[in-house]
Amino acid sequence: MQRASVTAAIILGSLCSAGLGAWALDVADVTREWTPEGKKTAAERAKLPAHDDMVRIPAGTFLMGSDKKVDRNAYPAEFPQRKVYLDAFDIDKYEVTTVQFLKFVLATNRNPLIDWQYDGGNFQETMASHPVMHVSWFDAEAYCQWAGKRLPTSAEWEKAARGEDGRIYPWGNEPAGLSRANFGRTGLSGPVRDRPERLLLYPPIISVDKYENAVSPYGVFQMAGNVAEWTADWYDPHYYKKAPDRNPKGPEKGTQRAFRGGAWVDSTPSVRPAQRNGTDPQTKMNWLGFRCARDVKDQAEATTTQQTNLQ
């Protein structure tokens, strides 16, 4: 699947008139500065509760990729489906939230994100539990390292999302619906990013702890929809044809970084965990966030799923 590009002029002309500001615009080249009052407000908001839980994904094999006979929405980049072995690892139970990223920004003296309206006092408390967006791959990697973690590999992300049995969605093979995932309305033809006015028909991002009825087999939330998620890998649509069957880490080099999970603007095929895509690692979009992973030091004891916590 190719993600369509649109000019900033078209997007800003359509969205600013609707009061939507930077929605659906790549803001990689846009920066903001803290104001004294804004930074003071940010420091107060940083005290809000964070979602720091992690989930243990046990060592073992899982079905990675798709079988066209089972999933008619599968793309060629998902072939061939095969068994892959992964060592045990921990992964964030939830997407990294705005308030978690705010703590990092303040601790490392970074500029605020483009969608943070601190100066006008518009950073509502509800935003704290929303997934962070408008972050590049480099931002995501820096945050994970700061938190003592790392970005998950694409294979780790997929196993955490769909378990071992090759299911199409985190909850099984039943089609995605708005009661299970925050994604774009089906039935509308054409890429949303070519028609920015359609964003008015699409749901916004929501808190990372919603959809308890649609968690993955390991209890990981929102591995389908809300925001797509950066992974550690370089992206190559042909990688599966040559990838190792044990702890694959993606191509050794490339020009795009892989992301997974689909987003609130996407249609049903794009929110399947097997769906693969990539983009420039400098990209900062309102549909793209991340979560972190962590190595398990004692693999001998990592044979069962268990919840862990950073604190």
Language-model-detected regions and their locations in the chain:
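Bacterial N-terminal signal peptides
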Residues: A9-S17
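Functional-site microenvironments in short loops/helix caps that host divalent-cation chemistry
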Residues: I57, L63, D67-K68, N73, ...
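A short glycine-rich, aromatic-capped structural motif
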Residues: R45-D115, V135-S136, A224-G225
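Short coil/loop residues immediately preceding or within conserved phosphate-binding loops
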Residues: D52, Q81, L86, M127, ...
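Short, structured beta-strand segments at or near domain termini in extracellular proteins/domains
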Residues: N286-A302
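Short proline/glycine-enriched turn/loop segments at secondary-structure junctions
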Residues: N247-P251, N277-K284
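Bacterial N-terminal signal peptides that target proteins for export
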Residues: M1-A8
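N-terminal pre-domain segments of enzymes
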Residues: L25-L48
